Amino acid sequence: MTKKTGYREIYLLGILTFILMFSVTLIYPVQKEFVMERFNIVSLKETSLFVSVNLAAYVIFSLIWGSISDRMGKRKIFILAGFLGNAVLMFSLTLAPTMAVLLVLRFIEGIFTVMAFSLLMASVLDIVKQTHYGRGMGILGMGMAFGNAMGAPFGGKIGAVDPLYPLYVGSFMLLIGASITAIALKERKLESRSASLRDALLLLKEEKRIFIPYAFSFVERFTVGFFVVIFPLMLAIKYGIGSGSIGMYMTAFLIPFAFLQYPLGAISDRIGRVPPLIVGSLLYGIAVVSVGIVAPPMLVVVMVLGGVVGALMYPPSAALAGDLANLAKRGTAMGGFNLFGSLGFAAGPFIGGVVADRYGFQASFAVAGLAVIIIALIFFSSLIEINKKVSLHDKLLKNNR
């Protein structure tokens, strides 16, 4: 992949991603107590805005930060600012007097979160060789998934004592992340930079195929929006499960999802992005639909299986975005990947809340799962074509050696 120093840097980026994701997912198991009970909210749709406005900031700023970073040729300063700003804004959420103020603060917090996250992703692509994007994204994906897996149950446990505790702990952890960034993360000289923000916005026009991994990023994050908002509310409202146990149910999905990120990313480097992406998407869609049908305690089994097949999707889709982007647009490409992912993440909770309010939780998860399956079927032929071209290219390279 890289030299040993490159490995160390990628692992450091994975650790920072873990800290970031751990911190921002602490609050999810206690949304009922922190949002619904604190501000007397009864609608699932209105409650979902707590997550949706945060992710709306991701949508607006992910591509902007990637482009500015490429243009300046710097990553570290943006990652550091993202951690620090997120720490301050997360603490400020505990002081919000009204729901309206809370939503404004959540939006600003999202600006800093995506600043750190999108540039952590771009930094991995700066280090790894193109043939090892899958492994690089796998390491980053493990950091993200383990952060989610540990943040959710821990947030549920401490949130059962006081729903403000997850925010206090999250703010403190983000300060730790900022300290590690300032001390240990090196500023690398980028090989090239984007010419302008206009170039970033025209990236899809220049390389139309990059829309494929972007679409998978959208739908994968779309379903995650259901898991972080609608799923814990379903457990609390429909099944009467407490916040501590809600975190454990979320962990049943996230642990296998985390453990399999790196090995499946490495497999996609060897066999190609397309096979695991197609198979993972179809099976994952079925698993998501099943979440709304199967009741506890068997729901744990569905969550575990969902985590296994879900891990097939993320590394190859993120790596495919890196494969299709030219060197000058790596940061911009991953900013676009995050942009579409954030669109899905922002839309998921709101659409899930609307459907659940009107038709119930079972229909809500059916919408999420079918969305994944439909995207896989729409792009099936395009992915097969990409796979054929890659196989032919690899064969020609092998014959020329």
Residue ranges and their predicted role:
Residues P166-A182, F365-S381:
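Symmetry-related core transmembrane helices of the 12-TM Major Facilitator Superfamily/SLC fold
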Residues V30-L44, V229-G244:
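Short amphipathic helix-loop junctions that connect adjacent transmembrane helices
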Residues G73, L95-P97, G240, G272, ...:
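Helix-breaking motifs and short loop linkers at transmembrane-helix boundaries and internal kinks
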Residues I77-F91, P275-V289:
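Structural signature of the two symmetry-related core transmembrane helices
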